[in-house]
UniProtKB/Swiss-Prot annotation:
One of its GO terms (cellular component) is ribonucleoprotein complex. Part of the 30S ribosomal subunit. Contacts proteins S5 and S12. One of the primary rRNA binding proteins, it binds directly to 16S rRNA central domain where it helps coordinate assembly of the platform of the 30S subunit. InterPro entries: Ribosomal_uS8, Ribosomal_uS8_CS, Ribosomal_uS8_sf. It comes from the Bacteria. Keywords: Ribonucleoprotein, Ribosomal protein, RNA-binding, rRNA-binding. Belongs to the universal ribosomal protein uS8 family. It comes from Bartonella bacilliformis (strain ATCC 35685 / KC583 / Herrer 020/F12,63). The keyword rRNA-binding applies. Pfam families: Ribosomal_S8 (PF00410). GO terms for molecular function: rRNA binding; structural constituent of ribosome. One of its GO terms (biological process) is translation. This is Small ribosomal subunit protein uS8.
Length: 132
């Protein structure tokens, strides 16, 4: 089955796993998903992830979710730029999420990074998702 929005699918799987208090979630692997997971791990929203072989030459990511005092560290995670409606932002138009408590993840010419890093490096790009 073809998937029209692989990143949106991963975010939905994470959201569903959090609502069911799961410790891990499995999602198909891709380079973009790996970069987004790297940012989430670096910012402390997930414990980590492992690439596992699912057979037939395909790989999956096993994502270990992070909880603090029996509640998820991720309160909301939402897709912004979608396949039917791409959202691009310049450096000046990157807004803070929850007054700086959350992050936006952007795909820029310099790689996938947070809104803080994009402002520091003075680059804009596609606004992939917001996490709080």
């Amino acid at each position: 089955m073809s998937m029209s929005d692989p990143l949106g699918d991963m975010l939905t799987r994470i959201r569903n796993a959090i609502s069911r208090k799961k410790s891990k979630v499995v999602t198909p692997a891709s380079k973009l998903r790996a970069r987004v997971l790297d940012v989430l791990k670096l910012e402390g929203y997930i414990c980590g992830y492992n690439q596992i072989d699912s057979g037939n030459g395909k790989f999956e990511f096993e994502i270990e979710l992070k909880y603090f005092e029996n509640s998820s560290v991720i309160r909301t995670i939402s897709r912004i730029s979608k396949p039917g409606r791409r959202v691009y932002v310049s450096t000046k138009s990157i807004l803070q999420v929850a007054n700086g408590l959350g992050i936006s993840i952007l795909s820029t010419p310099k790689g996938v990074m947070t809104d803080h890093e994009a402002r520091e490096q003075n680059v804009g790009g596609e606004l992939l998702c917001r996490v709080f």
